[in-house]
């Protein structure tokens, strides 16, 4: 909803993604477009009232067949974090693991969350960080609401320079960029994607 309110409709195919990336914009490919049967499995949440294995599978998928991709994984419970850690290591996965809220990775503008990063299944201390603890010295100026339209307006104000980027978000973004840069330096990152 936030991307829609920013004027960025969902991508419906690979060409839409390529056009968004050519404009240096993010692209959102709905799960139903990426893998319709997985969307059916995920939709069982409404019927069952709990997340099922479909949500876990969706987080673990590499959306770029045959190419390296950094997966941003999230967990709400320590045992799920342990499961994802074991998977990242045993499957030689490129992943960044963060705590989650409502199933999505935390991007807290007030404090830095714990971030663990694996490249080719190896934990990277240089691309990981402990959670910020203790009292906050200062709070960033944030909007009073959390709805999609309010968040989209806030994002536009930050991007345009009208508001500063909260330091925890800047650090988190820098860590993602550093992990992707390290991923791109690997020899297998230069290999052509499988057909």
Positions of predicted regions on the chain:
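Internal gly/pro-rich beta-alpha loop/helix module
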Residues: 10-11
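Walker A/P-loop NTP-binding active-site region of P-loop NTPases
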Residues: 1
